[in-house]
Amino acid sequence: MGSLVTDLPAAFQTTLLKDGNEKGDNIHKEIHDHDITIGDEVTKEEARHMVELTEEERVIEKKLRRKIDSLIMPLVVLVYLMNYIDRNNYAAAKLQGLERDLNLNDTEYQVGLSILFVGYVLMQVPSNAMLNFCGKPSWYLGFFIIAWGLVSTLTSQVQSYGGIVACRFILGVVEAPFFPGILFYLSKWYTKSELNLRMSIFYSGSLISGAFGSLIAAGILSGLDGARGLASWRWLYIIEGTVTIFIGFVVTFLLPDFPHTWKLLTPEMKAVANRRMALDAAEADLDAGGKTSHLAGMKAAFKDPKTYILAIAYHGITGAAGFQNFYPTLTQTLGYDSIISLLLVAPPYVFTVFYSLAHGLTSDKVGNRFWFYMYPVPIVIVGALLFMFTDGFGPRYFSLFLLNFIFVMNGTIYAWIANAIPRPPAKRAAALAFMNSIGNAASIWTPFTYNDADKPYYREAMGINIGLVGIAGICGIIMRFYLQYQNRQLERMENEDATLTERDVKKLEKTAELEGIDIATARMLQKGYRYII
């Protein structure tokens, strides 16, 4: 009888034992803290409930969660807000003469916009390795926040096309580590059952930036033009970049690294924090069937068709959302000056913030991903058509509210990804990195579809947006049928008394390979598990 030992972050281990002459897997649990060995073979469900928090620990856990939420979540949302503000102030600066002062033509402006995402995509994978090497999230995140604030501030001094392209590329490089870094960081503080809501709140930072970033830009651009001999768009970079640098220092010294190192936690809270994360990891390790290396996780992710379906879908969503980089330019086509155009950006984003949170909560409550992913598709298409073929202020401004439903899809697809690729963690991490890179690659080429010659309707860009959101919708339909097929296979395979054909065994082997686990564990873990559709 062989065994597979899974190392856990706490002082206990779970050993999965496989016997080829018996059905399923047997679980042998050793708790080393107390030198206790439970020799009886138990089922997977019994193993899951063998170690739980006591009632007293649960009371402490609630206090712990409130303390974590009160500091960590406001900080990460604030930083994500500044991340998008610093990234998108390029569009606001365009309204106040950036193109004119730097002698940029239409194509050169678009290159300056898209080059950021070249650096962003290239830095995605290396950033995770850098974070693991650093080992201190506060220093790691703080350094890159300060770095992109500094780059944003120095952008105010550029005098040429080459200067703006260089600054935008470097900005993409130093902004890239933040998103995967936050995913890693939050996973060290919150259990998997707590992460969904926190990620929804975190994502709202990007939408809030669309609303308040335009209001801040309007105030700066209207009041500081010519101050100390500088154009208002230069002041925009100086002020917003300086604020980001300050926030970076706050994060460096205020953001706690890990529960066991946070001085504001009592010894009891630290113990509960470590214990609850250890229990969460133990359950995850049971699901994974063993520890999976980053290389094995990448291989498993690239062999899974779901990875490619979701990556193409995310590319379509991100590409169709490319209008956000031109939002002030789109509102300017409504017939108002640059300041009013910036103010008009805020209401659609404010609406989207509240709607997206309600959408996400409802989707979780209903337990459905497909319909909540699909219903925004026709809404976005109608919004694009309205912008393309109407002239009045009312319908054209209303079309922007409809176009913003693409951000609702963006939130839903991340929840779908988490369910469609649940284990092992290394596979999920590799799949997320791949999908994020493929998705953001759309931002490299879509800026070139928004040409000044196409004002005020931007029919080429809007037509491409319709095609991209249509592709995302088709991928959603394919995903639904594929998950239904996999659920039927899970239902068939979970019957241990059923005689498996050679074809069934091959399917089970493929499932085990895709999940990164052995065949016996795969069959046992299938019991009762179904993909959310």
Model-found features: residue ranges?
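Structural signature of the two symmetry-related core transmembrane helices
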Residues: 139-153, 370-386
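Extracytoplasmic
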Residues: 69-106, 122-123, 127, 213-217, ...
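Intracellular terminal tails of multi-pass secondary transporters
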Residues: 1-82, 96, 106, 252-287, ...
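Extracytoplasmic gate region of multi-pass secondary transporters
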Residues: 91-92, 296-361, 414, 447
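Conserved MFS/SLC helix-loop-helix module at the cytosolic interface between two early adjacent transmembrane helices
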Residues: 122-162
